[in-house]
Amino acid sequence: MASYILRRILVTIPVMAIVALFVFSLLYIAPGDPAAVIAGDQASPADVERIRQSLGLDRPFLVQFGTWLWRILHFDLGNSIFTNLPVTSMIVQRIEPTLSLMLLTLVLTLVVAVPLGVVAAWKAGSLIDRAIMAFAVSAFSLPVFVVGYVLAYVFALELEWAPVQGYTPIAEGFWPWLQSLILPSIALGCVHIALIARITRASMLEVLQQDYIRTGRAKGLGQRSILFVHALKNAAVPIVTVIGIGVALLIGGAVVTESVFAIPGLGRLTVDAILRRDYPVIQGVVLMFSFLYTLVNLLVDLTYTIIDPRIRY
């Protein structure tokens, strides 16, 4: 196991290097000149050129990339073009709402989706199964922002059960924190609940047809023990795989959700940076999300060996 973990970490190094190259290339792929954006519309060509030199944009591409990568290795993501604040500190200030939203959404998804998928497989072909699958198809088809606006209107504006917008840090209390995130988590989690419920149902149906399940039933094992102890454990590998892939969807969905509910997280920071063409901030956030997704994939691979002892590396 230790050798496998070491190999996986070594594999992530070239992956992150390629990601870093792509992120840095955004400066050249994106339209517009960062120096001209900083200088403003009234600046002369000489002013723009002076800013280019101060930013090092007049140097060769590989030299700029090497300098930028060296700073990254020292946790220096540069400064924002507009606020002149360190990008690292901006990310640290905004990361709590985003991670809180993603973690709460993930917990909500697992608590709801896995039991729904298990029940749908247990009652395959019944009215309950069809109702769950109809809900899954409907939830999967709805955009995050549509669900968000509907939830905000019904439960925040009309019923006043939760705040419409904003975020309350968990340091100010668990209940206010939960109230500020419950509607965004439901809006963001609908697609993931639908996806994981369908995958759980399909995986459980395959496992429930195996001989050892029939043997357990013949020996008098209870239905709950068969479903949640024996069948679910052996059906968990595809579910964990989809959960790992779903982290990328969570990252993308968090950007939209934070915009709908005015949550001051990394999603809002990214949108504001894109609108202002604040390239250092965009690069820093994308690089951080890429590292997070790579780490999640590593954890998913390690989880395989825990839930299925037959998998060895």
Predicted regions located by residue number:
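Residue-level recognition of pore/gate-forming positions within transmembrane alpha-helices
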Residues: 12, 20, 42, 110, ...
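Hydrophobic alpha-helical transmembrane segments of membrane transport/permease proteins
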Residues: 15-66, 159-180
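N-terminal signal-anchor/signal peptide hydrophobic helix marking the start
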Residues: 6-16
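Membrane-water interface segments at the C-terminal ends of transmembrane alpha-helices
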Residues: 22-29, 59, 67-70, 134-165, ...
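Hydrophobic alpha-helical transmembrane segments of multi-pass integral membrane proteins
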Residues: 17-22, 103-107, 150-151, 287
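Alpha-helical transmembrane segments of integral membrane proteins
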Residues: 2-4, 92-129, 144, 157, ...
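An internal, D/E-rich "acidic patch" concept
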Residues: 58-114
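Short hydrophobic helices that act as membrane-entry/anchoring signals
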Residues: 3, 7, 63, 67-71, ...
